Amino acid sequence: MKERSILRTLFLWRLINALSIRSFFQADEYWQSLEPAHVKAFGYGGLTWEWQHGLRSYAFPMLFEMSYYVAWILGVATRMALQGLAHATALCGAVVPSGAAGVAAMKAVWELPEAAQELVEYYGVLYGPRVVMAAVAACGEFYSVLLVRKLYLRVADKGDDQKGDAAPVSRLALMLTMTNFFNCFFATRTFINSFEMTLTAVALYHWDWSGGLDVGSLGFSASLAVAAFACLQRPTNVLIWAVLGLFLVLNLVRSRRWQLLLTLVAKVAAAGALAVCANIAIDYYFYGGVLLPLLRFIEFNVTTPLAAFYGRAPWHFHLLQSVPLIVGYALPFFVGALLTHNFRRGNAGLLGSPIMQIKCVVVLNIALYSCIDHKEFRFLYPLQPLFLSLSALEMHTWLQHHHARGTAWLKRVQSLLYVLPVLSITAALVLNTAHEAGVVSVMDYLHSAVPSAESIGFIMPCHSTPWQSHLHRNDLGKLWAISCQPPLDLLHQEDAGDQLLTYMDESDHLYENIPEFIHKNFPPVFRRDLRSPGRQYAYEWPEFLVVFEHMDEAFMKEYLKDSNYVEVKRFFNTLSHWDSRRAGDVIVYHKSPWY
């Protein structure tokens, strides 16, 4: 396949993938990407403490801000077009019936432009970021496939890595990446890890895999700049480039190419300076001041134990869960690639072999990530281009070997290569459309089915739903949810680790004793005149109340039984959930006016 065909295929596939997503995976999907962009574009939304304290770079959310501006422009253009039509209709007033029917018709014509603008803008806000992520994911996978081809031609001893017959291995890599479960489930979600994976794939493709011969090339300069920018978005990305950079330096020293070594140092400095300047400019645009979120991120996550506030996982989490989940059904070939060296001739020795370098990067990154207390599947996602490279090359070698031998059972094994991709895509589709879909659907409902509301409240674990990036309503009254602020006052205390063990945020206090929390922080729900005179409450009962079924059964249904609240809508969310607090349906209550 031609490169253009590969890119077109990937984009169309990921666009379908992105538009099919109806579910929620983790809070960062919305709160660390879409919400800051929505705040910047429209002037309202929710900013988490990380954004309030400058721990995050705005480079990734800026992509969505641009899509929001496109949505706004399309909305305005739609309104102007319909207003022109309305004026034309008014000029043709003679054909409009007289009387009440004519007045109603003209009123509808004049109101249509505003309603159409709101509708176009809203759907642009919902689907614009998905188109952006389809492009981001497709770009990352495109360069991952090109990387596989480039490595194959090099390790197959073809000489020039731009020549030779790499079509079979390219098609295999394309099939593996398009049907990979985690790619189908995760790649088009608005996580910065997907953006990081794409930057990593681009930089890896342009990297100097020749041992130093391409250090002076323009492509290698681009690789350094993109890699530096990726490290500024996610500091842990430096673990990839530190290993590859060390191999490159050792190769140059071993071959005594001192001039190229000096060129490398100069290019690294220039690329780093360029990336830092670009990042500072972007963050200045958002924060209104010069700062380096990288430094504040390191302060919180490295120099203090507060990163563990978001959870700890056993040392083997990445080894036994993250890697199998991300690699998917190609796992046997990935493991085989790590344990063997079946690829053809290539450069001899550890230093000169691109495959051995990749193995070192993968092993060391998994080991180092395993040393960090807070672990999530997505933290390893930037390694996906390398996972794909090892899996595709090993599978290609294995298929060639057994095809040449003509083994009878090969046909039975090959049938799995059709079944497993289908199962992989199906599993991702189910999770994308059904599991945890209720927390997204409820925001769509509150946007479309609630014409006005004095207040909307969410009594559930913090950040359980999207926010204004899906609600997109600045005409509502008070909008609130239970919070989960980390203990930032412990940042510079020596015993922060010990205090963290006993620290409880607001969500913890809520679920430790639901009745006590409600009675302490809310006024009586039955009558306004029952509240204690002069007493201030943390929350007021909202007009629309949103809870999980777990909360409803544990407390809320019985508590609200004799109040003005009635259940008005229920959304399926999960059959089961690893966090029991989020189990069951999402329920919406509505409170009629006080009597």
UniProtKB/Swiss-Prot annotation:
The chain crosses the membrane at residues 58-78, 85-105, 128-148, 185-207, 212-232, 235-255, 260-280, 289-309, 319-339, 413-433. Pathway: Glycolipid biosynthesis; glycosylphosphatidylinositol-anchor biosynthesis. One of its GO terms (biological process) is GPI anchor biosynthetic process. The keyword Membrane applies. Mannosyltransferase involved in glycosylphosphatidylinositol-anchor biosynthesis. Transfers the third mannose to Man2-GlcN-acyl-PI during GPI precursor assembly. Belongs to the glycosyltransferase 22 family. PIGB subfamily. This is GPI mannosyltransferase 3.
